[in-house]
Every structure is written in C-alpha cells, then in structure tokens.
A protein has these predicted regions:
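Short, intrinsically disordered low-complexity segments
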Residues: 2, 28, 49, 61-64, ...
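Detector for Asparagine
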Residues: 2, 35-36, 92, 125
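Residue-identity detector for glutamine
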Residues: 4, 42-43, 88
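N-terminal single-pass transmembrane signal-anchor helix
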Residues: 2-33
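Periplasmic/extracellular, small/polar-rich flexible segments of pilin-like filament-forming proteins
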Residues: 54-129
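Membrane-proximal N-terminal amphipathic helix
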Residues: 37-63
C-alpha cells in the first residue's frame, strides 16, 4: 500500500491563520516603537535647544541674541542659516526655525515639533542685542 505523507490543506490553512494572528499582534508594537523613537529624538532636540540657551547665557553673561542661540544649537558641523522668519538650524535631519521678534534678546527658548519640522520660539532679533 502506497501511503503519501505531507500536510493536509486544513493543517496548512491553520498555520497561515496562526502566522497572520501573530503578525497582526506584532505590527502595532513595531509602529509604537517607531513613534516612541521619533518622540524621543524630538525631545532630545528640544533639550539641545534648552541647553544651548543656558550655555549661551553662561558664555555671554546676558541673554543671547537669536543668532547667538542658533550658533550654539548647531550640530553635526551644520551651521545655522538665515531664513525669512529667523534662523534655520538642522539637527539630526529635522529643520528648526529660530523665530525673530523685536526686543533683541532671547529670554527663553521653547520648541514645537510637528513631523520633521519644528519651531523654536525665541524673543530676539537676528543681528544683535
């Protein structure tokens, strides 16, 4: 008697269903991990801006101008560049704009991030105190 060995169609379907269920449970976890990593990178950038503000105050013994702050925020050898609304700084591939206002000094540095673009809110002007 010739007996054929192998898996039945029902066994194969059950394995595929189980793999599908496991994949459906794993995908949201990977998505959350990606979002958490992006959020951590944004928070790191925000901390870098706050640190740069504190360093600039310590260095100049006064509140820094926006350009002075931008100089301290640069990373990876990338210099700040003037923009229509202030100074743009690129950190880890994300572009931040240090906004300029009228009173000449940067009394506080705050950040708002949406996607890969962030805004650093700062009171000050581009050229000097």
């Amino acid at each position: 008697m010739n007996k054929q060995s192998g898996f039945t169609l029902i066994e194969l379907v059950m394995v595929i269903v189980i793999i599908g269920i496991l994949a459906a449970m794993a995908v949201p976890r990977f998505y959350d991990a990606s979002n958490n990593a992006e959020l951590a990178a944004q928070q790191g950038t925000e901390a870098a801006v706050r640190s740069a503000h504190a360093i600039a105050i310590a260095e100049f013994k006064r509140l820094p101008t926006v350009m002075e702050l931008a100089t301290h925020v640069t990373s990876d050898g990338t210099a700040a560049t003037p923009a229509a609304s202030g100074v743009q700084v690129s950190i880890n591939g994300d572009t931040y704009t240090v906004l300029t206002f009228t009173d000449g000094t940067c009394s506080s540095a705050t950040t708002t991030t949406t996607g890969t673009t962030g805004t650093v809110g700062c009171v000050g002007n581009i050229t000097g105190p």
